[in-house]
Each structure stands twice: as structure tokens, then as C-alpha cells.
């Protein structure tokens, strides 16, 4: 049977001014939040609660199982990591991952960050002492609660579904990209690919003082989407073009990429494909786009990157 995409109509709420209207949950309401279009709440999105990490603290996560899932077939697993002050279900409605899953038959997991709707990653909160080295920071943050939750969810999904362990992917938006990037740098050996929108990492977390890279996991296929008008956090002490440049250089170094990419322009998506001896890197500059992710980005991630 030909794979299909299901486009559900929704009821627009054009008066909405909330970042994540709670009324969306379980309804057909759709909104446009700062240029980010939502989809109707997916009918098959499962909400789960439980203690799955050894510290005894409860977590919440959402699982999407498309009707096209075939239990006898090895199936990819996609982690969708929400932005700051968002939720797992919020990431599901502000992206098109569930629609891609309908077409392709893979499983989606959308976890909630454990605390305050913010992932436990360096660069989110400045709680490390100033004199602490990048090495000690990296070691301390290597196995946070959120990281342990991801590992626990992988094991849970492997028990419940016929998951292809060689096709586990992670994608994040903004703070979720911080989480995705940190996980890729520390535990990327279990990922087939990592992708993110906005949210480039601060350079002190990528490079030692001598310029060598900070990396525990080795190479991993990476996709970086950078909106042209992304902007910087309040009181940021760094340059946007510089941080984007060196976030790209970081993975070019780790993946041993060729310096000259193949270029393709699709509408407002300016795409650079870097071939790597160890893993590829895709860099996308999105013209006229501010901080956020386009609704079709999940399709780009899958069609150009994760599907291979």
C-alpha cells in the first residue's frame, strides 16, 4: 500500500497569544505562535506517567503509534525534544512528526523535561562555578535525570515495539536542541542521527581552552537548522553568526567532513550537505525565519536524513 499522510482540519484560534495554550490538549484547536503553526492534537497520542529512573522521581512522556506500524518489521524510533517551557505534547503539535510517522510507520516518543519544563543541560542555567573547567562540567552533566530518562525510554520502547536499535534518532527545538546536542556529544554512539532547530550551543561547551573538541561519543550524523532571524538570548555575550559557524565547525571536525559542501536551495531553505569520513553533516540556513521550526521540518529531516 502506498504510504499516506493524513491532514486533519482544525479550528483556528487567531486570538491566541499564549506560548502553549493548554486548551489545545485533546482538542482540534490550531494556533500560530510566533510563526509556528500547530496541528490538531493527534488522536493516537498516548500520555504516560511513571517512575523509570533510579532516583524514584516520576516522569511524563507521550508516545505516538501510527496505524501504519507493522510489529513484524524492524522500526525506527524518533525522540522529539521540546523547546523551553514547552511539553512533549506541545512538541507533537508544533511539529509534523506524527504525520511523517503516519506515512512511514515509525514510533515517536515526546518526553517532558523532568523539571520546570527545561532540560537539564549546560547552557540553560548558569549554575556551575566560574572556575570549574569544561572537563568537570561535562563529566557532571553526563548522566542527568533527563539523560537517564532517555535511556530508560529506549529500553521501554524496545520491550513494547520491534525497534531497530540501529535507527534511533533524536530531534530538538531550541532548548530541545541543547538537549539533543548534549546527548549526541556524550552518548551519540547509540544514535543513528541527531537534528535540531535553533538553539546553537555555547562554544565553551564545545571546545577546550586549547581549541580541541569536547566529545565523549565520537561521530554521529548531524543536521543543524538555523533560522536567519533566530536572534540571541537576553544578555548574550556572543555573536550569532560566530556561534553558528563554530557549531558547524565542531561537527565537521568530529565527523571529519570535507570542507566544501554540496549546495541545494529549496525555496527559503539554503542547504549545505557535508560528506564526512566518519559521518555526514547537513547545515540549513532558513531565510526569513525567526526562532522556531517550520511545520515541514520533520519531513525534511526524514526525507533527506533519517530515512537513509
Annotate each language-model stretch with its function.
Residues 87-90, 117-121, 203-206, 231-235, ...:
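Extracytoplasmic/secreted cell-surface and envelope-processing proteins
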Residues 1-77, 103, 142, 146, ...:
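A domain-start/cap signature at the N-terminus of enzymes
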Residues 267-270, 287-292:
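Histidine-bearing beta->alpha loop at or near hydrolase active sites
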Residues 40, 46-48, 52-62, 73-165, ...:
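Serine-hydrolase catalytic machinery in alpha/beta-hydrolase-like enzymes
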Residues 192-278:
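The feature captures the conserved acid-bearing segment of alpha/beta-hydrolase catalytic domains
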Residues 79-81, 197, 286:
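Alpha/beta-hydrolase
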Residues 158-160, 165-218:
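Primarily recognizes the serine-hydrolase "nucleophile elbow" in alpha/beta-hydrolase
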Residues 296-308:
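Catalytic active-site module of serine/aspartate enzymes centered on a nucleophile-bearing elbow/loop
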Amino acid at each position: 500500500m502506498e504510504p499516506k499522510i493524513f491532514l486533519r482540519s482544525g479550528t483556528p484560534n487567531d486570538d491566541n497569544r499564549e506560548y502553549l495554550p493548554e486548551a489545545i490538549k485533546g482538542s482540534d484547536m490550531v494556533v500560530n505562535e510566533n510563526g509556528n503553526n500547530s496541528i490538531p492534537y493527534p488522536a493516537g497520542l498516548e500520555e504516560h506517567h511513571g517512575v523509570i529512573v533510579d532516583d524514584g522521581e516520576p516522569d511524563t512522556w507521550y508516545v505516538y503509534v501510527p496505524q501504519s506500524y507493522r510489529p513484524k518489521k524492524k522500526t525506527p524510533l524518533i525522540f522529539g525534544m521540546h523547546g523551553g517551557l514547552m511539553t512533549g505534547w506541545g512538541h507533537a503539535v508544533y511539529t509534523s512528526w506524527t504525520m511523517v510517522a503516519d506515512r512511514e510507520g515509525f514510533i515517536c516518543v515526546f518526553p517532558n523535561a523532568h523539571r520546570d519544563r527545561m532540560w537539564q543541560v549546560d547552557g540553560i542555567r548558569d549554575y556551575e562555578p566560574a572556575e570549574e573547567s569544561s572537563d568537570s562540567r561535562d563529566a557532571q552533566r553526563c548522566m542527568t535525570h533527563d539523560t537517564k530518562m532517555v535511556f530508560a525510554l529506549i529500553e521501554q520502547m524496545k520491550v513494547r515495539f520491534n525497534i531497530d536499535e540501529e535507527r534511533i534518532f533524536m530531534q530538538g527545538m531550541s532548548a530541545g536542541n541543547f538537549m539533543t546536542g548534549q546527548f549526541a556529544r556524550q552518548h551519540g554512539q547509540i544514535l543513528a542521527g541527531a537534528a535540531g532547530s535553533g538553539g546553537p550551543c555555547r562554544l565553551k561547551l564545545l571546545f577546550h581552552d586549547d581549541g580541541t573538541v569536547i566529545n565523549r561519543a565520537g561521530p554521529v550524523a548531524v543536521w543543524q537548522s538555523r533560522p536567519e532571524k533566530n536572534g540571541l538570548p537576553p544578555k548574550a555575550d556572543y555573536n550569532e553568526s560566530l556561534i553558528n559557524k563554530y557549531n558547524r565547525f565542531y561537527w565537521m571536525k568530529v565527523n571529519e567532513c570535507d570542507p566544501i559542501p554540496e549546495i541545494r536551495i529549496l525555496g527559503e531553505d539554503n542547504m549545505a550537505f557535508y560528506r564526512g569520513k566518519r559521518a555526514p553533516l547537513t547545515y540549513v540556513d532558513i531565510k526569513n525565519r525567526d526562532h522556531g521550526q517550520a511545520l515541514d521540518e520533520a519531513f525534511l529531516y526524514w526525507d533527506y536524513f533519517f530515512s537513509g
